[in-house]
Amino acid sequence: ARAQHAGLAGTPRPIARDAPLFMGFKSGLRRNQATEEDVTIPSGPLAGGTTLHLSTLALELDSWYELSERDRVARMYAPQVTPAQAARFTDDAPAPAERLERTAARYGRVGHVQALATVRRDGRPRILRRDVNTVDDGGPGLYFLSLQRSIDDFVATRQAMSAARSRAAPGLDGVLNNGINEWMRVTRRG
């Protein structure tokens, strides 16, 4: 994707050639997705079905790539994760054992994966998601599709992504110092 869109407005040069997504990281690690069984409605008139959510997000990549690799890794995963560790991830990225509130107080920020780990059910993600890079609106963006048993699962996951349960750091809110939220803006939802 990067090679196809080199030079596109808002798509900076430092994106690694082998990066599957514009932000430079892999999305589909083993065990970081809900299973089909996890997202299937078990009973009732919609048994065997699921619910779907689709968002279109604009990405602010210029300022993202002004961050050091260390800072990008910290924001994607957790402040305690190093670039060397992140490069070796093939399975679900482990969330630090430290509680989210403690990380926020200690580092003044939390990581995207770390925040999402707080909403798992029996240790597994609640949504089955797909992220697809796009330039359809003239700049870098992302189509985000999720399947979940109930829209409540999407809402809980979205609240976790906003670190809704942690306000331990004065500079942490739903966007600032909160994973990758500062570099994404929802333009459409359905």
PLM region descriptions:
Residues 1-190:
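Long, histidine/aromatic-enriched segments associated with O2/redox biology
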